[in-house]
Amino acid sequence: MTILNTAKRALHFLRIGLAAKKLQRTQNETERLLAKRALAGLFADARGITMKVGQLFAGTDGATPFQELVEGIEPLPLKAMIPLLEKELGQKVKSVFRSIAPAIAAASLGQVHLAELKNGDKVAVKIRYPDISDAVDAELRLVGLMPGVGPVNRWGFDLDAYKRSLRDNMQRELDYRSEAQRQDYFGRAVQVPGLQVPKVYMDLCRERVLVQSRAEGVLIDKAANWPERDRLAIGQTLVTTLFKSLFVAGEVHGDPHPGNVFYSHDPNGQALVTLLDYGCTITIAEQRRLALLKLIAGCRERNPTKPLDCFAALGFDSKKLSYIGGSLPALCQILFRPFLLNHPFNPEQWQLGQGVNDLLGDYRWWFRSAGPSDLFLLMRAFQGLIQQLQQLDVNLAWWPLLQQAVGRDLIERAMAYQLPAVELPTATALSFDQQAAKLCVRVTEGDEQRVSVAMPAEAVLDLEHLIPEDVLERIKASGKIDLKQLADSIRANGIIPRQLFVFEDGGKTYRVWLE
C-alpha cells in the first residue's frame, strides 16, 4: 500500500466525517434524506473498516440509504475473482465446482458467489477482495492516529486498548480459516430450536476463501410482516441463541447487522433463523460468563452480591468504579431491566439511555470508560437483538428464556461462584440487598393522614417530576431543601434506605424517604 493510497483512504475518511457532521446538523427532512444517501454512498465506496462502520449505521437506522449497505454494494466481476480463488485452492475452479455464478452480494472484506460442488452440494463461496488486507492496514494506521477528544479525553477512556481491540478483530476477520473454525464451533456448541448455522467445508477453506452450505431466506424487513406466530418463534430463537452462545458456548456473534440473518420456513412451516458471517465473534472466558450471570441473578433476587466485584471480574477497572460504587446496584436495575420482569418485556418502553443519565449524569462516561475494550462488541450484540425484536414487534419474557437456554444448574453454579477479591473500601461497594426497595411518600395534616404511597425505589431518580408542581415551587422557594444536592447525594451514595426530606407548608407535612 503506497503513501498515496494511504492518503486517499485518509481523504475518504475526512469526507465521511464531514458528511456525517452535515447529516447531524440537517433539520429539513428532505435534506436529511439526501445527506443520508450521500453518506451511505461514501461508506459503500470505501469497503474495509469504513464500510463496516456504515453497516453499523444500517443496524441502527432503518432508513433506505443505509439499508442498501446491508444488501451489499456493487460486487467485483467473477473474472476478477477467479484467479484469486484458483490460487487459494491450488487447482482450477472446474476441478472443484460444477458451476459458480457471479457474486450475489458484496460486503466489507469480500463477496459471496453461489456455486455447486462436483458432488452436487449447493454452496456459497466467500472470497476476500484482492488487496483488501493492505487497505485495512492503511485504515488501521489512520485509526492509530485518532486523538482522544471529548468524553474520550475527559473521562480517561483507554483509547489505545480500543485501537488494539479494533486491530486484533480486523486482523482476525481477514483470515477466513479462523472464521471457518469459529463458525464450525458455533454450529456444534449453540444448538437452539429454529436456528441454522451453515455447514462449513473445512477442506476447501483458505485464508482468503470460505466455502459453506448455501443459505436462503429473506431479510428482517420482510419477516417483520409475517404472522405473529412466526415472529414470536423468530424472536425466541434470536434471544435464546444470544443467551446460549454467551453463557454456555462462550462465543458470541458480534456482527448483528440485518444482512447477516436470513429468515425462512422449514418443510413443516416452522420459522427458521439462519445466522451468517462469523468473522466477528467475541470469545467470553468462563470467569466473565459466570460473573455476568451472577450479576443478573443477584440483581433479580436482591441478594448480598456486590455489583462492583462482578464488574471487576468482567474486566472493569475496579478503582474507577469505586468512585460510583454506591450507584452500581441501581445502575444494574436499569441495565438488566429485561431480566427482572416476570412478564413479556417491551423494548419500546426501555428508556435505557435516559435511565442511566438520570442516575449517573455525566458520570455515565466514567462508567463506560471503566469497561474493558471488548465490551462494545458484546453491547453491540445486545443492541442488535433489541433492534431485531423491535422490528419484529414482539415482546418476550427474558428470564424464563435465559433459564431455558442455560439450565438451572449453571445459574446455581454462577450464584455460588466465588468472585476474585477486590481490594477496595467496603463503603464503596454496596450489595443488592443493601439497596432500598421502596420510595415512600406521606402527607399529613394535623393528626390526619392525607396521602400515603409507595413506589419502586428507582423512582427517586425522577423525584422532581413526581412532586406536584405547586408543591415543588414552594419547596424551591423555601430554600430549605436543595433537590439538586439531594440527587447528587443519591448518585454518590446509592439508593439506600434513608430519609430524604421533611417539608412543612400550610399546615401540611410532607415526608419522603427510602426503605
What are these regions (language model features)?
Residues 1-243, 263-286, 297, 305, ...:
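Broad phosphate/nucleotide-binding scaffolds in NTP-utilizing and phosphate-metabolizing enzymes
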Residues 95-96, 100, 180-182, 244-247, ...:
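Phosphate-interacting basic helix/loop segments used at nucleotide- and nucleic-acid interfaces
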Residues 117, 266, 445, 504-505:
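Acidic surface patches and DE-rich sequence motifs
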Residues 130, 216-217, 446, 458-460:
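Residue-level signature for short turns and capping positions that connect secondary-structure elements
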Residues 250, 255-257:
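Conserved catalytic-loop position in the HRD/HxD motif
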Residues 291-294:
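Short amphipathic alpha-helical recognition elements used for nucleic-acid or partner binding
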Residues 417-440, 447-452, 459-515:
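Compositionally biased, non-globular sequence tracts
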